[in-house]
A protein has these predicted regions:
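Internal alpha-helical scaffold of NAD(P)-dependent oxidoreductase catalytic cores
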Residues: 145-165, 174, 185-260
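Rossmann-like NAD(P)(H) cofactor-binding subdomain of soluble oxidoreductases
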Residues: 86-138
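Phosphate-coordination loops involved in phosphoryl transfer and adenosine-cofactor binding
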Residues: 6-9, 94, 147
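Interdomain hinge/lid region at the active-site interface
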Residues: 244-311
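Rossmann-like NAD(P)-binding element
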Residues: 61-91, 95-98, 102
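NAD(P)+-binding Rossmann beta1-loop-alpha1 motif at the extreme N-terminus of oxidoreductases
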Residues: 2-59, 63-66, 70
Length: 320
């Protein structure tokens, strides 16, 4: 039997942008997978109307997951932490459970405690680096994952990383402490994980294995800090609007591109900020220092070096 066939029944918990897009991607790029969706009644009804689910549930969780081969948790971080114990109790022994949360340290640590004594059940941390500034099932897209990186944090590849988190000094700077590369563990060879990796490839994403702390450090700088920078600039400009709509009345495409992330709702970011606040706090301090340095260079040609570095980073970003 092909490893892909180990995953015939998928239960998706949360059918917002990510969960809904994953369901639509399964529909478009795989064959023969039965999709069950669990969420609020109106949301799962919409998912079924869009063809993203064969079977829908709201309310009690057990019926939605008790026959699943893959349980895909696409819920907010706090909700995921609350629901993990119930998933551990009611998921079948053969099931692979994975999440799509934007931070990983707390999720992986909780899952290790819950699933370590649950027989053959397996948890695999995940984070698809895909999204939009708009949320909800109405904005779900079967092609959302194409060309993106899919971060994976497995149990055996994150233990040492999380031990480092537990035993590090409280005063340690999360940005100056070196990020740790995690050893490869046997979780990669588990047939269920192999099957899930095949699904990731079919929906167009590239897997990247790393540790939980390493993940949160990287996304803190590359994803969460840019969001806060966009919020800061947008709220600053909002506070300086005059009766003629200036300065926004003279804004061009550059400002719209820069502030695209400012359209994201706080409800999407609340849990992310709370669970990655140490990295973000340190990152904001260093970023504020960089802004001070730029201000001091305004009257000199020294800004050229900063522009050159920015150009190189932009070129590098386009290569990923």
């Amino acid at each position: 039997m092909s490893p892909t066939h180990l995953i015939n029944r998928v239960s998706i918990l949360g059918t917002g942008l990510i969960g809904g897009s994953f369901a639509l991607a399964l529909r478009k790029y795989t064959e023969g997978i039965h999709i069950t969706a669990w969420d609020r009644r109106d949301t799962v009804a919409r998912a079924k109307d869009l063809g993203a689910a064969d079977e829908i549930f709201s309310g009690e969780l057990k019926p939605a997951i008790e026959n699943a081969d893959l349980i895909y948790v696409a819920l907010p971080i706090s909700t995921t932490l609350d629901i993990l114990p119930e998933i551990a109790r009611h998921s079948p022994q053969h099931a692979l459970v994975t999440d799509a949360c934007s931070t990983k340290v707390r999720i992986v640590r909780a899952a290790e405690e819950l699933f370590s004594g649950s027989g053959e059940k397996l948890f695999l941390g995940g984070h698809p680096m895909a999204g939009k500034e708009l949320s909800g099932i109405a904005n779900a897209d079967a092609n959302l994952f194409r060309g993106t990186t899919y971060a994976l944090v497995g149990e055996s590849s994150s233990n040492a990383d999380d031990e480092a988190v537990r035993h590090s000094s409280p005063e340690a700077d999360p940005l100056t402490s070196p990020a740790r590369s995690m050893p490869t563990g046997t979780i990669k060879e588990d047939p269920r994980v192999v099957a899930f990796l095949k699904i990731i490839a079919k929906i167009g994403a590239r897997p990247l294995w790393l540790g939980a702390q390493q993940h949160d450090y990287a996304v803190g700088l590359a994803s969460h800090l840019p969001q806060l920078a966009a919020v800061a600039l947008a709220s600053f400009l909002y506070d300086h609007l005059d009766e003629n709509g200036l300065p926004i009345a003279l804004a061009g495409p550059g400002l719209r591109d820069t502030l695209r992330l400012a359209g994201s709702p706080y409800s999407t970011w609340r849990d992310i900020v709370l669970t990655n606040r140490e990295v973000l706090s340190a990152g904001l301090d260093l970023f504020a220092r960089r802004l001070d340095e730029l201000r001091d260079k305004l009257a000199s040609r020294e800004l050229e070096a900063d522009f050159d570095a920015a150009n190189e980073l932009y070129k590098l970003l386009r290569s990923f």
